Design a protein with these regions (language model features):
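A conserved positional marker within WD40/Gbeta-like beta-propeller blades
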Residues: 50, 116-119, 188-191, 232-234, ...
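Blade-level signature of beta-propeller repeat domains, shared across WD40, Kelch, NHL, RCC1
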Residues: 398-425
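Beta-propeller blade signature
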Residues: 51-59
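Inter-blade linker and blade-boundary elements of WD-repeat/beta-propeller domains
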Residues: 2-10, 60-89, 96, 121-172, ...
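Beta-strand-rich domains and repeat architectures in extracellular enzymes and scaffolds
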Residues: 7-50, 84-87
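Loop/turn segments within WD40 beta-propeller blades
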Residues: 20-26, 31-35, 89-106, 171-178, ...
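Conserved strand-to-loop turn within each blade of WD40 beta-propeller repeats
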Residues: 41-44, 112-115, 183-187, 227-230, ...
Length: 425
């Protein structure tokens, strides 16, 4: 990557949660730099964690001064979070046109999980203005950036031994109905929330052990999938909660003796947990996942459950994060402890599906033979282990601190320690 296609931010604390704002900033058409807004969260082993919104320096700050006098990013707003956030996400792009009952039209929402589901409101009511010269140098106010806690939803556990909600591991925000969020928990449950009314719609025991991640089927308000410590990927339909569909189970290890203490007929030997699940937004038949401590990424097809249709092998250490771009091209980014970000173009490997067959679990089965892919189309070597990544929406071309201009398109943000880098794809 060249200096013209990379931006960097050094946070005051180790970064864990990371997400790119998906809705246009006020004035974004006139000021492309304002679309660079990232939500980030800290990870420290105490009750003093924080979340923050960071953005690029505004063009109007840089009118008279040399671009290189300023860091790329600045903190726009921040708030205390207590325990670390296990996940942080901005509202979906569709939320800006959603009929909210308790939200200002000009504000944007963030959500975090940890000891509870928290919904935050980010506002930028007061435009940033440049004041007169002070001491021969232009100064600027901080603008009206505010990040305030809107709702805390701790929930109640279905598990008999729990009187209060157990810690939440992750969540998924529904794109079609942004008032819906589904959370996953270490107490084996998933809970569907209506954040507009601050109520739990339903809670179900989803797995035999901890649930680590959850994702809505794109385009659906009823179907979601989850992965967990029991090594399974399961699909649930809110219209029929009596049963779930097991789409994939990690292979049981060889030469492991069966459990000795009168196991139930459904007991399985210990298997490798699945940590993350992510749908391809361009074709929701396809999902990506990876095992705990695993260096391979499995690509699964809902039309062909049971085994991966693709396996991506190029990382040299455990994978920590993955994410699909929002374009029609199925571009997948993966990152891990080998200090690498790899981009995979899977267009030539995927079964083409028509619009009518998308989002259907009973579509015709494609050829289920697993393809092993070991040639990413792009690689970026970082200075340390990468713990998180986030794709941007489409962003217009803009002037960099060097004075050069970037092409329009997507950016990819990665987190490693206290550093965040934004890479032009």
């Amino acid at each position: 990557m060249t200096q013209t296609s990379m931006l960097q931010y050094e946070a005051p604390w180790p970064v864990f949660g990371l997400d790119w704002c998906k809705t246009p900033a006020p004035g974004q058409q006139l000021r492309p730099r304002s679309s660079f807004r990232l939500g980030i969260s800290s990870f420290t082993e105490d009750y003093k964690n924080r979340i923050a919104v960071v953005g690029l320096q505004d063009e109007r700050v840089l009118v008279e001064d040399d671009y290189t006098d300023y860091p790329d990013f600045t903190i726009l707003a921040e708030a205390q979070h207590g325990y670390p956030a296990t996940s942080l996400q901005w509202q979906p792009a569709s939320a800006s046109s959603y009929a909210w009952s308790q939200k200002s039209p000009s504000s944007e929402l963030l959500a975090t999980t940890g000891d509870a589901l928290r919904v935050w409101e980010y506002t930028n009511d007061v435009p940033q203005v440049v004041s007169s010269y002070v001491g021969g140098r232009q100064t600027t106010n901080a603008g009206g950036h505010r990040l305030s806690l809107k709702t805390v939803l701790p929930g109640q556990s279905k598990v008999a031994s729990q009187n209060t909600g157990a810690p939440l591991t992750n969540f998924s925000w529904n794109e079609k109905a942004p008032g819906l969020i589904v959370t996953s928990s270490i107490d084996t449950t998933c809970t569907v929330w209506n954040i507009d009314t601050s109520t739990a719609i339903t809670q179900l025991i989803a797995h035999d052990r901890e649930v680590y991640d959850v994702a809505w089927l794109p385009g659906s308000t009823d179907i979601f999938v989850s992965v967990g410590a029991d090594g399974s990927l399961r699909a649930f339909d809110l219209r029929s909660l009596e049963h779930s569909t097991i789409l994939y189970e990690t292979p049981a290890p060889k030469n492991v003796p069966p459990p000795s203490a009168s196991p139930s007929t459904s007991a399985r030997p210990p298997t490798s947990p699945l940590l993350r699940i992510c749908f391809n937004p361009a074709d929701s038949n396809y999902m990506s996942t990876f095992h705990m401590d695993g260096s391979e990424i499995q690509i699964l097809d809902m039309r062909s459950p049971g085994q991966p249709v693709m396996e991506l092998k190029a990382h040299r250490a455990q994978v920590n994060a993955l994410g699909w771009s929002a374009t029609e091209t199925p571009l997948l980014a993966t990152a891990g402890d080998d200090c690498q970000v790899l981009l995979w173009d899977l267009a030539n490997y995927m079964q083409i599906s028509t619009a009518a067959s998308r989002s259907r679990m009973n579509s015709p089965r494609p050829d289920a033979k697993k393809q092993v892919i070991s040639d990413p189309v792009m690689a970026y070597a970082a200075q340390s282990e990468i713990t998180g990544l986030a794709w941007s929406p489409q962003i217009a071309g803009m002037s960099m601190n060097t004075g050069q201009t970037t092409a329009p398109g997507e950016w990819l943000a990665i987190a490693m320690g206290r550093s965040i880098k934004a890479l032009k794809v």
